[in-house]
Regions:
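Acidic, Mg2+-coordinating phosphoryl-transfer loop and its flanking beta/alpha structural elements
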Residues: 132-169
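Substrate-recognition "cap/lid" segment bordering the active-site pocket of phosphatases
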Residues: 90-141
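Active-site neighborhood of HAD-like aspartate-dependent phosphohydrolases
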Residues: 1-53
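A short acidic, often aromatic-flanked loop/helix-cap motif at beta-alpha or helix-coil junctions
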Residues: 40, 121-128, 155-157, 171-176
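Structural recognition of alpha->loop->beta junctions
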Residues: 104-120, 162-179
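Metal-dependent phosphoesterase signature
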Residues: 32, 39-78
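Substrate-recognition element of Asp-dependent hydrolases with the DxDx(T/V) motif
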Residues: 64-68, 73-105
Length: 191
C-alpha cells in the first residue's frame, strides 16, 4: 500500500489570504495583511462589516484567478510524488468555488491527477498517512495520521504541543517532515 499524503489547498498550496487582502485593500482603502489574522476566525480579527466584505471575496472568480502558489509548494508536491507517495489535495471550499480551484490546480499543479482533488468539510474522515494543513482544527480532529501544520499568523500562537503536530514554516521543512514520518512508519511496520 502506498503512503498517502493529504495537502490542504488554501494557504498551503496557494496564497489565498494574501490575494484576498490585496483585493480588500484596493477596494476599501485599507491596509490589512496576513498578519492581521491572529485567529482562523476572521470575525475575531476584523470588525463585522469588514469581515463580511472579506469573506465575500472568497466567492469571486477574479480573486481565484489572481492566486499564486505558496513559495516552493509546486516543488514540494512534485517531490513527494517523485518519492513514490500518493498525494491528494483536500479542500473545504464552498462548492461554487470548486471549479475555479480545480482550474487553478490544473494550471499550477498539472502533475496532480484531478481524481486526487477532494472537496470535504470534515477532514477527520480521510484515511491518510500524513495530513498537512494551516487550520489546526482539521489536524487536531484527525488523530489517526501524522500531522503537519504550515505555520501562519492565525495558528502561530496556538498551543498544539499536546497533539503531536509537527510545525513547519516552509515547504522544505514539510518535505523533510514527510520523509521522516515515512521512515519512522516503515521502521514500525518492519518490527
Amino acid at each position: 500500500m502506498r503512503y498517502k499524503i493529504a495537502l490542504d489547498c488554501d494557504d498551503v498550496l496557494n496564497n489565498l489570504n494574501e490575494a484576498v487582502c490585496k483585493v480588500f485593500n484596493e477596494e476599501n482603502g485599507a491596509d490589512i495583511t496576513e498578519d492581521t489574522f491572529t485567529s482562523y476566525d476572521i470575525y475575531k480579527c476584523l470588525p463585522f462589516e469588514d469581515a463580511e466584505k472579506y469573506t465575500a471575496l472568497w466567492r469571486r472568480e477574479d480573486v481565484w484567478r489572481s492566486l499564486t502558489p505558496v513559495y516552493h509548494s509546486q516543488w514540494g508536491a512534485k517531490k513527494l510524488i517523485d518519492n513514490g507517495f500518493d498525494v491528494y489535495i483536500t479542500t473545504a471550499t464552498h462548492w461554487e468555488n470548486f471549479p475555479w480551484k480545480v482550474e487553478w490546480l490544473q494550471n499550477y499543479f498539472p502533475f496532480i491527477d484531478e481524481s486526487h482533488i477532494i472537496c470535504i468539510r470534515d477532514k477527520s474522515l480521510l484515511a491518510v498517512d500524513v495530513m498537512i494543513d494551516d487550520n489546526l482544527d482539521n489536524l487536531i480532529g484527525n488523530i489517526r495520521c501524522n500531522r503537519v501544520v504550515l505555520e501562519k499568523p492565525w495558528n502561530k500562537n496556538a498551543h498544539d504541543e499536546a497533539y503531536s503536530i509537527k510545525r513547519c514554516t516552509n515547504w522544505d521543512e514539510i518535505v523533510a517532515a514527510v520523509e521522516e514520518f515515512y521512515k519512522q512508519d516503515e521502521e514500525l511496520m518492519s518490527n
